[in-house]
């Protein structure tokens, strides 16, 4: 049971009830009609990243669907929340990659997204035995990772919003959804 395809979705939901807010975020992302099972952070070998449209066309309502999901929620007015996933893909498509989840408060979209991307790349780099200075800035580590010849690409996806001004529950989700 190894996924051959994956796609990314993002959503936001606002409601007086926390669970309903999450449901609305899933609807906004287009994945509310599936039975979602969250899994850990491995991008399978030979797994193609496809468009949301292409991925959704291969799934049926009620289907059990595996995903890596970043989620954050608040009912504090104007509180900044972010959910992000980072993706690190190795040069050799027969090797596995990493997907990281990051959930934060007070970070803007760029900061949260870069953190998630850095985390995925660092996890992949450590499994490949790439030597690097863990205290160096992300840009420097990114150059080292890519210069090693092992890491082909890194990317991040993020949803960042301020909590509802009236204190309604606000939820953000970002998910890498797998197609078997």
From Swiss-Prot:
Keywords: Decarboxylase, Lyase, Pyruvate. One of its GO terms (molecular function) is arginine decarboxylase activity. Its cofactor is pyruvate. The modification Pyruvic acid (Ser) is found at residue 41. It holds the Pfam family PvlArgDC. Transmembrane segments: none annotated. Its EC number is 4.1.1.19. One of its GO terms (biological process) is arginine catabolic process. The record marks 40-41 as: Cleavage (non-hydrolytic). It comes from the Archaea. InterPro entries: Pyr-dep_his/arg-deCO2ase, Pyr-dep_his/arg-deCO2ase_sand, Pyruvoyl-dep_arg_deCO2ase. It catalyses: L-arginine + H(+) = agmatine + CO2. Belongs to the PdaD family. This is Pyruvoyl-dependent arginine decarboxylase. The gene is pdaD.
């Amino acid at each position: 049971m190894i996924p051959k395809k994956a796609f990314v979705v993002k959503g936001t939901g606002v409601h007086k009830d926390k669970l309903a807010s999450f449901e609305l975020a899933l609807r906004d992302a287009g994945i509310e009609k599936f039975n979602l099972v969250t899994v850990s952070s491995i991008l399978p070998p030979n797994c193609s990243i496809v468009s949301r449209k292409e991925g959704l066309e291969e799934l049926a309502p009620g289907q059990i669907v595996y995903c890596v999901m970043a989620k954050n929620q608040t009912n504090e007015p104007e509180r900044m929340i972010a959910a992000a996933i980072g993706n690190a893909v190795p040069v050799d498509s027969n090797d596995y990659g990493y997907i990281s989840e990051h959930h934060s408060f007070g970070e803007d979209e760029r900061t949260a997204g870069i953190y998630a991307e850095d985390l995925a790349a660092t996890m992949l780099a450590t499994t490949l035995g790439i030597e690097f200075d863990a205290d160096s800035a992300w840009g420097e580590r990114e150059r080292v990772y890519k210069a090693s010849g092992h890491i082909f690409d890194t990317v991040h996806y993020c949803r960042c919003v301020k909590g509802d001004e009236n204190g309604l529950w606000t939820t953000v989700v970002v998910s890498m959804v797998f197609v078997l």
